[in-house]
């Protein structure tokens, strides 16, 4: 059992007690919500009526039925007003019984309000400041959006597998809860399964129970419901650092150990130097099965990760730096609603890149930012509703599904705002004390954008004129691309030079022999995998190419096929999923027809939405029949969220 680390006291430029309330700019004040933290309209619960002390989860996992059943117990206190009912979020749950202080009470499940689920209304006459225990007995159903259950045939071994994905509003599909990032609780979990279990907390032991085992966990730092993470399957583990293990299926263990060993502890120490000590005790990684829909999920103590990180060259490990950074931004300091998601993800990308910069140099940090800028452009250009979803501060108060708003915007637009602030305020030496101040001030709390702004203006009171000159309207509330910061482009310039050479020679040379004399495999030998990714992306986007020189690759088949032949080792034979995807993007753009079926086959081996969704869009653009047939064949192997979003992308 590992006790929570005690947070180191970090010196600030002035004591918190001396901070005075500072007005923002007139424009920002006109946008200020009536209350801060702003109310979360993505929950149906009456979370504002109670203070929560602790949550206990008692779960039984049934692979045979593909269900989780059991109960959840909340230790609650009413606030200064009496209440007549307790409202919880549910979604596709069967609720069997509700007890207040061990006494059964009446309840009803209201009609479903898509996409927010069904409100569970519990009759309870409770006076002000009353402490009580609320127990709800429940079971998930076949329509559960929080879990994916895999048969042995869908895994890499002979055992079934299950995992949860609760962000943004799917905790309510796993257990009745106050499903809002505004509401944080410590947790105890007792999870019974026939296979090993991992959880977003620290393991405290296990108890045999016939053919099953009850696995016990605790989470002593308050977290919101969406950060609860559960997985169960044929899991084994190995050490990858002094406070870290990796968990995965047996056949992947050696690759995972090689990929992650030594680097994870470096990441933790670098982040601690930037902010303050890691508070969660252990930092472990679960490398999930192929159908896992995200790059990673920052479940406290147990990062859930995609197997596409295993690139066999350590180049994708920056995703772990991202999920680790969430230990401060998102997990310790949390957005109060999904309108302010950038406070989680923008800060996390910023910290991730500070880690990368500290370990590999500032040009590497800036190169990562350039890649992110390109991703942001692609994301906004492909949005169905950029007017609504490309603003940094979102407005989901009309009941919009936060999953529909999910994009690169909160990550990259958020990062670029923080990078811009770092730059105009005087660089890291000026900005770093604010980072520590911000995370210290809001630790274990949830906040909105205006609380961030208030803290920023208060801390940099002596630089108010600089902050007043920031175009806050464009950065926070306008759709589209933000102003582009100045990046160090050294690593990108080498890529852009090679791209431009290919564009020119594609129009001049006519035979594969001529291309082989002009280009060679060594062109890419000094590039890291991220530079290869940018190279392939820029061959398609041609943002670095003069307008009058841009080409359509489909008209230059000899050039495109020569390129793939010359760079076979670094491109077509790569095991790095980032490179593989960009390779297919180039080939489909060049209308190389054999690649269509190859891409379709590859979509059956990955579940990460970063690749699956644009992969289907690429396929749809060149062969809609193949795209639809491939999706119909594979749809039940994807996570429910991924399946639904691809269905929307294909307009099915």
From Swiss-Prot:
Q: Which reaction does it catalyse?
A: an epoxide + H2O = an ethanediol
Q: Which residues bind a peptide?
A: 165-167, 293-298
Give the Gene Ontology MF terms in alphabetical order: aminopeptidase activity; epoxide hydrolase activity; metallopeptidase activity; zinc ion binding
- Which superkingdom is the protein from? Eukaryota
Q: Where in the cell is it found?
A: Cytoplasm; Nucleus
Q: How is the cofactor bound?
A: Binds 1 zinc ion per subunit.
| Residue positions of the active site | 323, 411
Please verify whether the record's keywords include Metal-binding: yes
In the UniProt record, which is one GO cellular component term? Answer: nucleus
Record's InterPro entries?
Aminopeptidase_N-like_N (IPR045357), Aminopeptidase_N-like_N_sf (IPR042097), ARM-type_fold (IPR016024), LTA4H (IPR012777), LTA4H_cat (IPR049980), M1_LTA-4_hydro/amino_C_sf (IPR038502), M1_LTA4H (IPR034015), Peptidase_M1 (IPR001930)
Q: PANTHER family of this UniProt entry?
A: LEUKOTRIENE A-4 HYDROLASE
Entries under NCBIfam families matching the protein: leuko_A4_hydro
Query: Can you tell me which family this protein belongs to?
Result: Belongs to the peptidase M1 family.
Tell me, what does this protein do in biology?
Aminopeptidase that preferentially cleaves di- and tripeptides. Also has low epoxide hydrolase activity (in vitro). Can hydrolyze the epoxide leukotriene LTA(4) but it forms preferentially 5,6-dihydroxy-7,9,11,14-eicosatetraenoic acid rather than the cytokine leukotriene B(4) as the product compared to the homologous mammalian enzyme (in vitro).
- What is the name of this protein? Leucine aminopeptidase 2
């Amino acid at each position: 059992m590992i006790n929570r680390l005690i947070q180191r006291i970090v010196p600030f430029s002035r004591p918190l007690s001396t901070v005075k309330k500072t007005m923002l700019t007139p424009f920002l004040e006109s946008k200020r919500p009536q209350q801060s933290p702003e109310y979360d309209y993505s929950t149906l619960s009456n979370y504002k009526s109670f203070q929560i002390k602790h949550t206990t989860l008692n779960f039984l996992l049934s692979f045979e039925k593909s269900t989780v059943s059991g109960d959840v117990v909340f230790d609650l206190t009413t606030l200064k007003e009496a209440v007549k009912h307790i409202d919880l979020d549910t979604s596709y749950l069967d609720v069997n019984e509700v007890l207040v202080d061990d006494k059964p009470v009446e309840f009803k499940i209201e009609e479903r309000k898509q996409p927010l689920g069904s409100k569970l209304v519990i009759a309870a006459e409770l006076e002000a400041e009353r402490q009580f225990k609320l127990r709800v007995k429940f079971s998930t159903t076949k329509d559960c959006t929080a879990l994916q259950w895999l048969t042995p045939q869908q895994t890499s071994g002979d055992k079934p597998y299950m995992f949860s994905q609760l962000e943004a509003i799917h905790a309510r599909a796993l257990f009745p809860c106050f499903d809002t990032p505004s509401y944080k609780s410590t947790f105890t979990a007792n999870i019974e399964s026939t296979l090993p279990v991992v959880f977003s907390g620290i393991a405290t032991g296990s108890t045999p129970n016939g053919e099953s085992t009850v696995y016990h966990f605790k989470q002593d730092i308050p977290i919101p419901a969406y950060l609860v993470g559960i997985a169960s399957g044929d899991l084994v583990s190995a050490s990858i650092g002094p406070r870290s293990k990796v968990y995965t299926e047996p056949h992947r263990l050696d690759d995972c150990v090689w990929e992650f060993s030594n680097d994870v502890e470096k990441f933790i120490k670098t982040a601690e130097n930037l902010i303050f000590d890691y508070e969660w005790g252990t930092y472990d990684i679960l490398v999930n099965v192929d159908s896992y829909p995200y790059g990673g999920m920052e479940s406290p103590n147990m990062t859930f990760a995609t197997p596409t990180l295993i690139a066999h060259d350590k180049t994708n490990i920056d995703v772990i730096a991202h999920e680790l950074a969430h230990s401060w931004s998102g997990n310790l300091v949390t957005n109060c609603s999904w309108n302010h998601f950038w406070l989680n993800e923008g800060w996390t990308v910023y910290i991730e890149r500070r880690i990368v910069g500290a370990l590999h140099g500032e040009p590497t940090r800036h190169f990562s930012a350039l890649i992110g800028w390109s991703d942001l452009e692609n994301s906004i250009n492909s949005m169905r509703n950029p007017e609504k979803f490309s603003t940094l501060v979102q407005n989901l108060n009309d009941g919009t599904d936060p999953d529909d708003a999910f994009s690169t915007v909160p990550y990259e637009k958020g990062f670029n705002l923080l990078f811009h602030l770092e730059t105009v305020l005087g660089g890291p030496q000026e900005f770093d004390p604010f980072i520590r101040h911000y995370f210290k001030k809001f630790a274990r709390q949830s906040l909105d954008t205006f609380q961030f702004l208030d803290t920023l203006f208060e801390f940099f009171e002596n630089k108010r004129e600089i902050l007043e000159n920031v175009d806050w309207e464009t950065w926070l509330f306008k759709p589209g691309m933000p102003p582009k910061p100045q990046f160090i482009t050294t690593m990108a310039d080498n890529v852009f030079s090679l791209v431009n050479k290919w564009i020119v020679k594609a129009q001049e040379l006519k035979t594969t022999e001529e291309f082989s004399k002009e280009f060679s495999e060594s062109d890419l030998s000094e590039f890291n995998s991220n530079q290869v990714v940018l190279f392939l992306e820029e061959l398609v986007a041609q943002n670095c190419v003069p307008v009058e020189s841009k080409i359509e690759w489909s008209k230059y088949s000899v050039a495109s096929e020569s390129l793939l032949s010359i760079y076979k080792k670094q491109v077509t034979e790569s095991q790095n999923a980032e490179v593989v995807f960009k390779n297919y993007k180039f080939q489909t753009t060049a209308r190389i027809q054999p690649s269509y079926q190859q891409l379709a086959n590859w979509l059956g081996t990955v579940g990460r939405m970063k690749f699956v969704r644009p992969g289907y869009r690429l396929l749809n653009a060149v062969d809609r029949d193949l795209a639809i047939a491939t999706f119909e064949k594979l749809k039940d192997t994807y996570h429910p969220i991924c399946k639904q979003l691809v269905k929307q992308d294909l307009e099915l």
